[in-house]
Regions:
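A short glycine-rich, Lys/Arg-flanked "PGG" loop and its adjoining helix->strand segment in the class I
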Residues: 122-137
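Short, glycine-/aromatic-enriched active-site segment of Class I SAM-dependent methyltransferases
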Residues: 11, 143-163
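Conserved Class I S-adenosyl-L-methionine
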Residues: 185-248
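Short alpha-helix
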Residues: 164-180
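A short acidic, Gly/Pro-enriched loop at the edge of an enzyme's catalytic core
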Residues: 95-107
Length: 248
């Protein structure tokens, strides 16, 4: 069975984030980034955020993803935007990063921690703390459970064909605090499959492309299932964006 994020990527969606561009912009506006800033993006996918970072700040980004199959598309995106000199693209495992301690000023990781087990989440966040410089910042963006609901989590996992483990607000805060971070959070309505969110994230033409592809006969079942689930549970699931600062 095809994973939901891979399905949406195949439909033409470029922003595979629960809170879309709104949440990403809040994260980026919460930290000072200059051309000297060293950034690690974990789970970069096709590099949409990496491209935005370089174009906006002219900084260097190391972009990694565990899925080696997506990296050629990442490199194509980087080349198409003529920013190869700013970006290093590598395969990498969030729970076992290959970089020395205190290597980066910023780590950004969107829409990935939700898909990890509790143990894997803890391992990844500890790795982020390790590779961040003192005073560095971790920027994350995930799915928020507004209340504990095991059946809802199971239904979400079935809908997107991925075993996921979103947390409550208290759960997310505890995860980052346990690794020594001081987290600040923002949450709101998910935009991933919301019509207005699709337009905000992809533009009118991009949103139409996603919908048109999703309604092709071979795609209709999964597209409709995901669209219905996320809109039916708009009051049960939010996005959560977290700015977590490592003490100096």
């Amino acid at each position: 069975m095809e994973a939901g994020h891979k399905f949406l990527l195949r439909m033409g969606k470029t922003r595979l984030r629960p809170g879309g561009i709104e949440a990403t912009n809040w994260l980026l506006n919460s930290v000072e980034i200059t051309p000297e800033t060293q950034i690690l993006e974990v789970a970069c996918n096709i590099g949409t955020t990496t491209v935005e970072l370089v174009k906006r700040f002219h900084c260097h980004v190391t972009a990694i993803d565990l899925n080696a199959d997506v990296l050629p598309k990442t490199k194509e995106n980087i080349a198409r935007n003529n920013i190869e000199e700013y970006v290093t693209v590598e395969q990498g495992d969030a729970t076992n990063l290959s970089y020395p301690d205190n290597s980066f000023d910023v780590v950004i990781n969107e829409a990935m921690l939700t898909m990890l087990s509790d143990q894997q989440k803890e391992a990844a966040v500890k790795e982020y703390a390790r590779v961040l410089k003192p005073g560095g910042v971790l920027l994350t963006h995930d799915v928020l459970l507004l209340k504990e609901d095991d059946e809802l989590v199971h239904e979400l996992s079935r809908t997107i064909n991925v075993n996921v483990k979103p947390l409550t607000l208290a759960g997310w805060k505890n995860l980052f605090e346990s690794a020594g971070f001081c987290p600040e959070t923002k949450n709101g309505k998910m935009t991933l499959m919301n019509p207005a969110g699709l337009i905000a994230d992809e533009g009118a033409d991009g949103a139409l492309r996603v919908i048109r592809n999703g309604l092709k006969p071979e795609n209709t079942k999964m597209f409709t299932s995901m669209f219905t689930f996320f809109n039916d549970h708009a009051d049960d699931l939010n996005y959560i964006a977290v700015v977590s600062r490592k003490p100096r």
